[in-house]
């Protein structure tokens, strides 16, 4: 499968009271990958929300991945995204199988990306590229890093960190395969605006 386009990431606080409606609005606009990201300890709610997302993703033909929780991903039969503090990638690959999508956070490090590739990652994620609401203290990444990664890492490259429709085009031009977006997508005031933004992000890959 080709990993290229909009990579939507949920935020349970940002989407409070409109979780499934705004996610479905994004899916209507076109989402390549949807990541369920919830850092709470409410395992029951996380399972219910993830199950709801899986049903939506199946309806729209979108791949669902879970942030930081390989066991929940295995329970649902979906992929996982692992940060640098979430444990090694190899056990997750063994748990989820060869076909599962597994992503790895690499911050601004080509070495981490090459290590992730050697351990069986499906894609690598660099960032933050701009000021991030979700992770304001994350290491800064650059367009030069993106170009170097494009030459050295033979995997799809996701970019994250403060990405909006106003600043995303240069990232695609310099080799990004996936635009990972939270607030720039789900911060919209209406479901219709979420759909419009999703379509606009995807249009950047068509030009």
From Swiss-Prot:
Enzyme Commission no: 2.5.1.3
Keyword Lyase: no
UniProt remark on cofactor binding: Binds 1 Mg(2+) ion per subunit.
Pathway in which this enzyme or protein is active: Cofactor biosynthesis; thiamine diphosphate biosynthesis; thiamine phosphate from 4-amino-2-methyl-5-diphosphomethylpyrimidine and 4-methyl-5-(2-phosphoethyl)-thiazole: step 1/1
Residues annotated to bind 2-[(2R,5Z)-2-carboxy-4-methylthiazol-5(2H)-ylidene]ethyl phosphate: 132-134, 162
Entry keyword set: Magnesium, Metal-binding, Thiamine biosynthesis, Transferase
Cofactor field: Mg(2+)
Tagged with keyword Metal-binding: yes
Family in the record: Belongs to the thiamine-phosphate synthase family.
Protein name as annotated: Thiamine-phosphate synthase
Organism: Pseudomonas entomophila (strain L48)
Lineage: Bacteria, Pseudomonadati, Pseudomonadota, Gammaproteobacteria, Pseudomonadales
């Amino acid at each position: 499968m080709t990993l290229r386009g909009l990579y939507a990431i949920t935020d349970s606080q940002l989407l409070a009271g409109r979780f499934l409606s705004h996610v479905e609005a994004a899916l209507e606009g076109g989402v390549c990958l949807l990541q369920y990201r919830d850092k709470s300890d409410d395992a029951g709610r996380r399972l219910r929300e993830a199950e709801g997302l899986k049903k939506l993703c199946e309806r729209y033909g979108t791949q669902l991945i879970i942030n930081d929780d390989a066991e929940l991903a295995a329970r649902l039969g979906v992929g996982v995204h692992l940060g640098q503090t979430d444990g090694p990638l190899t056990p997750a690959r063994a748990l989820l199988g060869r076909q599962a999508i597994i992503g790895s956070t690499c911050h601004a490090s080509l070495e981490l990306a090459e290590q992730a590739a050697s351990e069986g990652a499906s894609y690598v994620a660099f960032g933050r590229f701009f000021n991030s609401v979700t992770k304001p203290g994350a290491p800064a990444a650059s367009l030069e890093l993106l170009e170097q990664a494009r030459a050295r890492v033979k995997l799809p490259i996701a970019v994250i960190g403060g990405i909006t429709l106003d600043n995303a085009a240069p990232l695609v031009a310099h080799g990004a395969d996936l635009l990972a977006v939270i607030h720039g997508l789900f911060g919209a005031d209406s479901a219709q605006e979420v759909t419009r933004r999703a379509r606009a992000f995807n249009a950047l890959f068509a030009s």
